[in-house]
Amino acid sequence: MARTVNCIKLGREAEGLDFPPYPGPLGQRIFEHVSKEAWQQWIKMQTMIINENRLNLVDAKHRKYLAEQVEKHFFGEGADQIQGYVPPAA
């Protein structure tokens, strides 16, 4: 039986991640409170953030910025918006 979590992003019970997706306490917090579905949404957002901001993940400052964005996305006011990006109409 799949592990379920009360997903903080979706606001409902959903299938949980199989393992912490990020190192340290932040990864454990994500593991305990974020669903697979919400994590996949983050992966898409993360890709846009990396590409549009031309982040180089070898650079410690860029990794720190991305870590701040993942924390804001799930546990804060939301990640920074991509300049010029307009979400598709539902």
Curated annotation (Swiss-Prot):
It comes from the Bacteria. The keyword Iron applies. Keywords: Iron. InterPro entries: Fe_traffick_prot_YggX, Fe_traffick_prot_YggX_sf. One of its GO terms (biological process) is cellular response to oxidative stress. GO terms for molecular function: iron ion binding. One of its GO terms (cellular component) is cytosol. Belongs to the Fe(2+)-trafficking protein family. NCBIfam families: PRK05408.1. Could be a mediator in iron transactions between iron acquisition and iron-requiring processes, such as synthesis and/or repair of Fe-S clusters in biosynthetic enzymes. This is Probable Fe(2+)-trafficking protein.
